[in-house]
């Protein structure tokens, strides 16, 4: 028998808090939870409050709440008024001066949701890092989640920071996001931007890879269970392989002539494609924030202007973009009092 002689290690307040935060419970808290739960709760609560009660009349000249007759698709928490610039719009700041009603009217809820939402997403990413470390696995889930964080921060924070004010960010609502997409197309020709193309390829490519992978696994399952359905056919602690990688490799080698040789390369590729797509699209949005242009084929525009019989899909799209700008600006920015005479509005074969 071995007897260890020594003193108990002194445990401070930090150790006690650490033990409590990492205690095994139904919903893990952890140190990341101190950031995640309050910010996510406040962001979600702010959005539900805004879409239910708060008007956008004072910022956009629009009705945007359930109280005013909107539905789930048309309700939104709209961006602050253009005159607010890039103010954080703190409730106790010089704009609202502690008046909650006025704070809602000038768009304070949008800034509240955007900032708390960003920190909530970061907290969720840190949560995945923390749990991965405790469980003893690699942190690739957290690395993958950096993609959505990059998109959110670039679209809702960095883009309006590069523009005149928070007004030009997307409002938090379904139809409001669609309006923002039309704005990006009309004012930035976003669909022809190579970073947008890479983003689309990444997201749709990731969906395709996911569908192919799921179907292939289902096709090559080992039938070593006698249960009634797939979900009960295997035990959680089984030591055997669930599906045949060799059979899957043979199948796709016959289909395409090439196939993934091992599971590591296959699953890394499934991680790499969509995350890279998200990051490239986020980089593209930062470029739009700086008003950078991409793929302006001026020679085609000049020839189309000189030759009425020459038109390409590109020149047609440019004409459509001009229409979006001319007709959208007056509606989208009523505070500017834009007036476009009929003779300056674009006209062409497509309009």
Swiss-Prot record:
Keyword Metal-binding applies? yes
Protein task = Photosystem II (PSII) is a light-driven water:plastoquinone oxidoreductase that uses light energy to abstract electrons from H(2)O, generating O(2) and a proton gradient subsequently used for ATP formation. It consists of a core antenna complex that captures photons, and an electron transfer chain that converts photonic excitation into a charge separation. The D1/D2 (PsbA/PsbD) reaction center heterodimer binds P680, the primary electron donor of PSII as well as several subsequent electron acceptors. D2 is needed for assembly of a stable PSII complex.
Matching InterPro entries = D1/D2, Photo_II_D1/D2_sf, Photo_RC_L/M, Photo_RC_L/M_CS, PSII_PsbD/D2
Q: Which PROSITE patterns match?
A: REACTION_CENTER (PS00244)
EC number(s) per UniProt? 1.10.3.9
EC class of the enzyme, as a word: oxidoreductase
Task: Give the protein name, as stated in the record.
Answer: Photosystem II D2 protein
The record's comment on cofactor binding reads:
The D1/D2 heterodimer binds P680, chlorophylls that are the primary electron donor of PSII, and subsequent electron acceptors. It shares a non-heme iron and each subunit binds pheophytin, quinone, additional chlorophylls, carotenoids and lipids. There is also a Cl(-1) ion associated with D1 and D2, which is required for oxygen evolution. The PSII complex binds additional chlorophylls, carotenoids and specific lipids.
- Tell me the organism: Trieres chinensis
Q: Which UniProt keywords apply?
A: Chlorophyll, Chloroplast, Chromophore, Electron transport, Iron, Magnesium, Membrane, Metal-binding, Oxidoreductase, Photosynthesis, Photosystem II, Plastid, Thylakoid, Transmembrane, Transmembrane helix, Transport
């Amino acid at each position: 028998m071995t007897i260890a002689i020594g003193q108990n290690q002194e445990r401070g307040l930090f150790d006690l808090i650490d033990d409590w935060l990492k205690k095994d419970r139904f919903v893990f808290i952890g140190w990341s939870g101190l950031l995640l739960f309050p910010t996510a709760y406040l962001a979600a609560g702010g959005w539900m409050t805004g879409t239910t009660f708060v008007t956008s009349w004072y910022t956009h000249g629009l009705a945007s709440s359930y109280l005013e007759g909107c539905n789930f698709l048309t309700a939104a928490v709209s961006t602050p008024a253009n005159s607010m610039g890039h103010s954080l719009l703190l409730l106790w700041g010089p704009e609202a001066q502690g008046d909650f009603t006025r704070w809602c009217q000038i768009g304070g809820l949008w800034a509240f949701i955007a900032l708390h939402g960003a920190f909530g997403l970061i907290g969720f990413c840190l949560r995945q890092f923390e749990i991965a470390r405790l469980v003893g696995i690699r942190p690739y889930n957290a690395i993958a989640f950096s993609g959505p964080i990059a998109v959110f921060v670039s679209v809702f924070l960095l883009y309006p920071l590069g523009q005149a004010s928070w007004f030009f960010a997307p409002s938090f609502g379904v139809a409001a996001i669609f309006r923002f997409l039309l704005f990006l197309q009309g004012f930035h020709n976003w669909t022809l931007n190579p970073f947008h193309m890479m983003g689309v390829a990444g997201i749709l490519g990731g969906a395709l890879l996911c569908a192919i992978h799921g179907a292939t696994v289902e096709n090559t399952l080992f039938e070593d269970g006698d249960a009634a359905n797939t979900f009960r056919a295997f035990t959680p602690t089984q030591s055997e392989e669930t599906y045949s990688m060799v059979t899957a490799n043979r199948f796709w080698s016959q289909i395409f002539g090439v196939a993934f040789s091992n599971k590591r390369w296959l699953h890394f590729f499934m991680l790499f494609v969509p995350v890279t797509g998200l990051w490239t699209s986020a980089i593209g949005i930062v470029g739009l924030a700086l008003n950078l242009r991409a793929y302006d084929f001026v020679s085609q525009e000049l020839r189309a202007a000189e030759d009425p019989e020459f038109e390409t899909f590109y020149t047609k799209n440019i004409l459509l973009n001009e229409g979006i700008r001319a007709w959208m600006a007056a509606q989208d920015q009523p505070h500017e009092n834009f007036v476009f005479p009929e003779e300056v509005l674009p006209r062409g074969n497509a309009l």
